Amino acid sequence: MGYTEVAAAPPSMAAPPDPQFVLRGTQSAVHALHFCGGAQEQGHQLLLSGSLSGLVHIWSLQTRRAIATLDGHGGQCVIWLQTLPQGHQLLSQGRDLKLCLWDLAEGRNAVVDSVGLESVGFCRGSILARGQQRWMLAVPGRGSDEIQILEMPSKTSVCTLKPEADAKPGMPMCLELWQTDSSPRPCLLAGYEDGSVALWDVSERKVCSRIACHTEPVMGLDFDSQKARGVSGSAEKALAVWSLDEQQALQVRGTHELTNAGISDVKIRPDRKILATAGWDHRVRVFHWRTMKPLAVLAFHSAVVHCVAFAADGLLAAGSKDHRISIWSLYPRS
């Protein structure tokens, strides 16, 4: 079953809105975005952005200004940001082969720890909370096709995931750690350079399933663990939708043709109603998650959109090479 996007907007696709507001001031391409509840801002929501210049900006969505700037990556691009379960700690991953742990409590902005990385690629890390104080971290490993799993904050190596001897998937490009409610066993979804997506059983260090989703490197993926369904984008002109059955087998459910090639990032909204893609064609595209029906094409940016992020309340942020971050309120959560 294939989904096909028509060239013209379908009658049900209303004229796209303008951004609710725009954040300016990074003075550099925006490569990473992450929303967090504001420990610093008396409960107000904050947006974190990582830029090509190596800086992390912390934005107040109330004042629409940066309230702090973190400089921990020696001028090298920041490609991933993630707050930890307790809220006031932040992980930032840069192309300086370093993952920094920041303490943001009470207005602090100090690096309290760091992890040396083995790979300089653009593969963002992933975490899985193991209670309030511990979490599992997946990052690209030393070998070009390897993934390293660490227990944090102890930095203890759990294992290295190496592809099967006969598989040649190339480099991991994107990672997603998760676990089902019914099982404590952590799983990892990895998108690879050859266009495949693999499901790893981390405890067993083995690939449960691998599917060919794309003919180009997988640039972004997201997974809906409640529906056991995921979506991925690549350098080509299609999104792939795939599912996971009870036997841990991945299956491609359909492909959705895009108007233009190249997806940098894809995110499913927390309520699992819609998803957004960041496009090389300067566009953010919004789809209905269950049907993959196109809902909106957001044409605000003047250069590649590198990243998208959803807040818990449904607000959407997009970061671009044009140095701007656009904030959108779409299809309010019911």
Predicted regions located by residue number:
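WD40/WD-repeat beta-propeller blade-loop signature
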Residues: 19, 29, 43, 66, ...
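WD40/WD-repeat beta-propeller blade N-cap
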Residues: 23-30, 71-78, 115-122, 163-172, ...
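Loop/turn segments within WD40 beta-propeller blades
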Residues: 33-44, 81-87, 126-134, 175-185, ...
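A short helix->beta-strand "capping" segment at the edge of beta-propeller domains
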Residues: 3-28, 63
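WD40-repeat beta-propellers
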Residues: 56-60, 99-104, 147-151, 197-201, ...
